[in-house]
Regions:
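Conserved catalytic-core segments centered on acid/base and nucleophilic motifs
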Residues: 237, 246-248, 279, 290-296
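Acidic Gly/Asp/Thr-rich repetitive segments characteristic of extracellular carbohydrate-active
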Residues: 1-25
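Acidic/polar low-complexity surface segments
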Residues: 33-59, 103-220, 259-282, 298-314
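All-beta strand scaffolds that present successive hydrophobic residues in beta-strands
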Residues: 27, 67-71, 92-97, 208-209, ...
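Extracellular beta-strand-rich solenoid/capping regions of secreted or surface-exposed proteins
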Residues: 11-18, 34-68, 77-96, 104-120, ...
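A structural signal for short, well-ordered beta-strand segments and their strand-loop junctions
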Residues: 25-28, 70, 86, 247-249, ...
Length: 314
């Protein structure tokens, strides 16, 4: 249900189970909304993500052994700035049978209505993706953000893949100094008009009817984040959106993703799933296995496995 205290109450329950290896906790089917109210804020240095200050975790499993959380087919929806699931300093943890999404995606979408070499008209649903034009910039708002669009990616209306003959298109903002300098204005009917200047022009492959994915938010949190843990398994998990990667493990040993899908949320019409890689492994050892997973429309790599350089202090 839509209860702002749900995450805090779940955390209190989990604290009583930490010292009881072998517990299986099963959720009833349904839709659960998670809010950061009443939760402690943490500053995690998450590999390949942007620093964002403190953030709360919806599900926080630290120091658990042989623990299973069965979502029972439930759907978890996260509000404001939250890291949905974190597993750390644990072993034998299983997460299964649930889907993860954000109430307000950290990216937005629009549909091209008209396109010329230097002018484009785009329709943006103000209910799904609240927006306005401020000081000549296209600004999107959410429960915890107000940010100017700095980049878009055009998606083919039929294939829902990046449109042929286009690529990432960058726009200048207060923090991004390289890119186009368009004149942007709002028009009637929830339309926005983007007019380029001088010798700037839109890609020849741009077409009316195609969708634009607007980027306007930093990469702040994966949907599932595992750190310093061993023998971790995620099975029958669906990540529909995340403010970063779908799954990220660092300094872990023996990790299995089985039917771990990163796909756009059904019925939303979205052309994007995770804001970055579907799955990412950093400095992990043992066996890393992916079985029967489906990754689509994430906005970076499907799978990335690597180490990193770090400073060792004696």
């Amino acid at each position: 249900g839509d209860d702002v205290s749900l995450a805090a109450r779940l955390g209190a329950l989990l604290s009583t189970l930490r010292e009881r290896p072998g517990v299986r906790l099963r959720m009833e089917p349904g839709i659960y909304h998670f809010y950061p109210q009443g939760l402690p804020l943490h500053r995690w240095n998450i590999s390949n993500h942007d620093a964002c200050g403190g953030q709360a975790a919806g599900l926080l499993l630290e120091g658990f052994r042989d623990f299973t959380l069965d979502g029972g087919g439930s759907r978890w929806v996260f509000h404001a700035q939250m890291l949905p699931c974190r597993v750390a300093h644990s072993s034998g943890v299983r997460l299964e049978n649930l889907s993860l999404d954000l109430a307000r995606p950290v990216y937005s979408e629009g549909v091209i209505r008209e396109v010329r070499p230097q002018r484009m008209t785009v329709w943006i649903d103000p209910e799904k993706y609240p927006w306005n034009v401020e000081n000549g910039r296209l600004v999107f708002t959410g429960e915890n953000f107000r940010r100017a669009m700095h980049l878009w990616l055009e998606m083919d209306a039929k294939t829902r893949a990046p449109a042929w003959g286009t690529e990432d298109l960058y726009f200048c903002t207060e923090t991004q100094k390289v890119g186009l300098h368009p004149a942007i204005k709002a028009a009637a009917g929830d339309l926005v008009q983007i007019t380029l200047k001088g010798g700037e022009h839109f890609f020849a492959g741009s077409r009316a009817g195609n969708r634009l994915v607007f980027r306007h938010h930093p990469r702040t949190a994966p949907a599932v984040y595992a750190a310093d843990s061993k023998d971790i398994c995620c099975e029958n998990i669906r990540v529909h959106h995340a403010a970063g990667m779908g799954f990220l493990a660092e300094r872990c040993e023996n990790v299995t993703l089985k039917r771990f899908d990163v796909t756009p949320s059904p019925g939303t019409g979205r052309c994007f799933s995770a804001a970055a890689d579907a799955a990412h492994f950093v400095n992990c050892g043992g066996k890393v296995a992916l079985e029967g997973c489906r990754f689509e429309n994430q906005l970076d790599d499907g799978l990335n496995v690597h180490g990193f350089y770090a400073v060792v202090r004696g």
